Amino acid sequence: MSKQESYTPPKIWSQDEDDGNKWASINRPVSGATHEKERAVGKHGLQLYSLATPNGQKVTIMLEELLAAGFQEAEYDAWLVNIGEGEQFSSGFVDVNPNSKIPALVDTTTTPETKLFESGSILVYLAEKFNAFIPNDSKAKTECFNWLFWQVGSAPFLGGGFGHFYSYAPYPMEYPINRFAMETKRQLDVLDKHLAKNAFMAGNEYSIADMAIWPWYGNLVLGNLYDAATFLQVHEYAHVIRWAKQLAERPGVKRGRIVNKTWGDEGQLENRHSASDIDNALASVK
């Protein structure tokens, strides 16, 4: 009988500190800071602490879209949080986000300053602060929130479920991979049927719902996430692919997706303090 078939849960759980998964060294069953370190602060009113994972990309795409739309007050400093090194457990970061997850944002233009965590919360805050990328029509606004929170509730099955067992688990496990592959394909089908009738998630208007969903599901169908496009047969979701490609061509998406990125061939930018930082990073890969 194989290891994955023979496991019997003990009466009381205890942590296996070397369980073989990629992130074992930073996983722990308690919260709070592990070391003292003040957070960096730049010159702009918005201070972002993040990494270019799908959740991190949501916020940098939003900030770059705001700047492209002419909202100069959306200028920001973006500081890399190296989660592999445990930087999310520094005292400065935990002071902003007690949950120790990226992204976290501080708006220093308010008194007292506003501390934000959870990517969906940050998107809503920025949309309301600048009155942008959120529909004014009540019906469309409701649709925007429907899909924004659909993503918040659904993506853990894609990331923590499928992505973990397909890419990061210590060895391939048939049951969880099959279980979460099925759910991921179901979610893609939900999106595909919606986008067959709508240009964007909230109808005809590009919004924070699109910015929340694209980094996960857009990257997935474009082959940028988990190297799983063939396994999941993403070509079956033509409307999701159409939408994903359309958004990928937006300057705000092209710029936002590389901020706090330290891997890959499509541009890297460890920290962002001005528009020229992104310009230079993108120019280096042309």
Descriptions of predicted regions:
Residues S2-E5, P135-N136, N146-P251:
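GST-like fold's C-terminal all-alpha helical module
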Residues K22-A24, N260-K286:
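Acidic/histidine-enriched, glycine/proline-rich intrinsically disordered or flexible terminal extensions
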Residues N82, I208, N260:
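Short, solvent-exposed turn/loop segments enriched in Gly/Ser/Thr/Pro and often Arg
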Residues M1-K185, L282-K286:
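GST-like domain detector, emphasizing the conserved glutathione-binding G-site
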Residues D95, E249, I258-V259:
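Phosphate-coordinating loops and pocket residues in cytosolic domains that bind phosphorylated ligands
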Residues K254-R255:
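C-terminal anion-handling pockets and recognition modules
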